[in-house]
Amino acid sequence: MDYFTLFGLPARYQIDTQALSLRFQDLQRQYHPDKFANGTQAQQLAAVQQSATINQAWQTLRHPLTRAEYLLSLHGFDLASEQHTVRDTAFLMEQLTLCEELDDIEQSKDDVRLESFIKRVQKMFDARLQQMVEQLDNAAWDAAADTVRKLRFLDKLRSSAEQLEEKLLDF
């Protein structure tokens, strides 16, 4: 059973996150291992396994990138373990430039420039995310997989910038 079916949701990117949360809570109550404490060892093991599956499904579906990766996996794209890389040279050059800029910001400890950088990267991420949503809605699986790969780069860059921000604030 796929994660969308487990939560009673249609297998698509845009989901009702409130329904996801409510169903998660219901499933957790229903399959909590403590409810099976007096059951057989097989029942206890099954409850632990089901609870782990529910938690994994929840973690996967609640985050936009992992939800997209999972949806793509249902259509034959195993992005989590693939060695396929982004082949868009212009995008890769842009990422290299952004990484160098972040290094410069770190060296100069320029928090104003960092704030501007974070906003710019967030705008880039949001634009790519919207592009991915449209591709997934239109079942353009190859294009969506490529966009997810690019979103990973941007997400990593955004995370690095936010870590630098925390580091600079500690001074």
Swiss-Prot record:
Keywords tagged on the record: Chaperone
Natural source organism: Salmonella choleraesuis (strain SC-B67)
InterPro entries assigned to the protein according to its UniProt record, in alphabetical order: DnaJ_domain, HscB, HscB_C_sf, HscB_oligo_C, J_dom_sf
UniProt keyword Metal-binding present: no
Protein name (Swiss-Prot/TrEMBL): Co-chaperone protein HscB
Main function: Co-chaperone involved in the maturation of iron-sulfur cluster-containing proteins. Seems to help targeting proteins to be folded toward HscA.
GO cellular component assignments: iron-sulfur cluster transfer complex
Gene Ontology terms for molecular function: ATPase activator activity; protein-folding chaperone binding
Leader peptide range in chain numbering: none
Keyword Chaperone: yes
Origin superkingdom: Bacteria
Biological process (GO), any one: protein folding
Assembly description: Interacts with HscA and stimulates its ATPase activity. Interacts with IscU.
Matches recorded under Pfam families: HSCB_C
Residue ranges of domain J in the record: 2-74
Annotated NCBIfam families: hscB, PRK05014.1
Sequence similarity: Belongs to the HscB family.
